[in-house]
């Protein structure tokens, strides 16, 4: 199911806001045990993915189709936002959020490159079959 850029912007912005609010509401519970701090990092990684999607959709609406997110400032800004939100819960959440976000970013980049990257034909130099210098 494919939605338009504007709809995707609205959905990802709403999900980012709800995820951030949920992380803040349940911050005491998320910081209570080891497994829940890992879950807090996973939620922070989800916040990273949704905020990156919203940010890139906004850029596509403003600058036109085909605009791609770069490491600086888009990815770095969204990563810092997610790490800050995870840091408000627990220090371990920051570490797990960073790890989960990097894994998620790797797979997002891998999927994006297979779908949207244009493959250029490989040019091989032609073999010259003419008279060259004679060797004595």
Curated annotation (Swiss-Prot):
Residues in the Lumenal compartment per record:
1-5, 56-75
User: What are the TM regions of this chain, as residue ranges?
Assistant: 6-23, 35-55, 76-108
Keyword Endoplasmic reticulum included in the entry's annotation: yes
Membrane topology is:
Multi-pass membrane protein
Q: What InterPro entries does the record tag this protein with?
A: KRTCAP2
Task: Kindly state which keywords UniProt assigns to this record, in alphabetical order.
Answer: Endoplasmic reticulum, Membrane, Phosphoprotein, Transmembrane, Transmembrane helix
A GO CC term assigned to this protein in UniProt: oligosaccharyltransferase complex
* Molecular function GO labels: enzyme activator activity; protein-macromolecule adaptor activity
Q: Which domain of life is it from?
A: Eukaryota
Per UniProt, what is one Pfam family of this protein? Keratin_assoc
Localized where? Endoplasmic reticulum membrane
| Pathway(s) annotated for this protein in UniProt | Protein modification; protein glycosylation
Provide the GO biological process annotations: protein N-linked glycosylation via asparagine
Phosphothreonine modification, residue list: 124
**Ranges per topology, Cytoplasmic:** 24-34, 109-136
Question: Where is the short sequence motif Prevents secretion from ER located?
Answer: 133-136
Report the family membership.
Belongs to the KRTCAP2 family.
The subunit structure is: Component of STT3A-containing oligosaccharyl transferase (OST-A) complex. STT3A-containing complex assembly occurs through the formation of 3 subcomplexes. Subcomplex 1 contains RPN1 and TMEM258, subcomplex 2 contains the STT3A-specific subunits STT3A, DC2/OSTC, and KCP2 as well as the core subunit OST4, and subcomplex 3 contains RPN2, DAD1, and OST48. The OST-A complex can form stable complexes with the Sec61 complex or with both the Sec61 and TRAP complexes. Interacts with PSEN1 and NCSTN; indicative for an association with the gamma-secretase complex.
Record's PANTHER family? KERATINOCYTE-ASSOCIATED PROTEIN 2
Q: What does this protein do?
A: Subunit of STT3A-containing oligosaccharyl transferase (OST-A) complex that catalyzes the initial transfer of a defined glycan (Glc(3)Man(9)GlcNAc(2) in eukaryotes) from the lipid carrier dolichol-pyrophosphate to an asparagine residue within an Asn-X-Ser/Thr consensus motif in nascent polypeptide chains, the first step in protein N-glycosylation. N-glycosylation occurs cotranslationally and the complex associates with the Sec61 complex at the channel-forming translocon complex that mediates protein translocation across the endoplasmic reticulum (ER).
Question: What is the name of this protein?
Answer: Dolichyl-diphosphooligosaccharide--protein glycosyltransferase subunit KCP2
Task: Write the lineage as a comma-separated list.
Answer: Eukaryota, Metazoa, Chordata, Craniata, Vertebrata
Name of the gene this protein is made from:
Krtcap2
